[in-house]
Amino acid sequence: MSDSFKYRAFIAYSHKEAEKAEWLQRSLESYRVPTELVGRETRFGPIPKRLFPIFRDREELAGSAELGPAIENALKNSSHLIVLCSPSAAKSIWVNEEIRVFKSLGKADRVLCLILEGEPSVSMS
């Protein structure tokens, strides 16, 4: 991870999937990267010993038309975006806005999708 990023990743999810997002955050932050991979160079920098910290918002977003400075700042300061994909996430204006903002920062190649439920091609019909 570049020193310019505060977070290894930002988890975008529908609050219906909050329990799964919390599990993923705990799992990633406690994961120990195999010793033989640590330090190996990648296009995103050297592989770290730990995938810590991971950003996950812990409260419902207020009923406003924008994400808010704390969320936007976390997106700017995250190396990667992990999207928990589900029908409810696809319908969430907040998840879609988090993806839009992250991609607008020039990091579209750092978006990782984890399909929880649904069919990937359904939203493209």
For the regions a language model picked out, list residue spans one by one.
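Conserved N-terminal substructure of TIR/SEFIR domains
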Residues: 1-84, 103-109, 117
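Short, charged, amphipathic alpha-helix that recurs within catalytic cores of restriction-modification
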Residues: 94-103
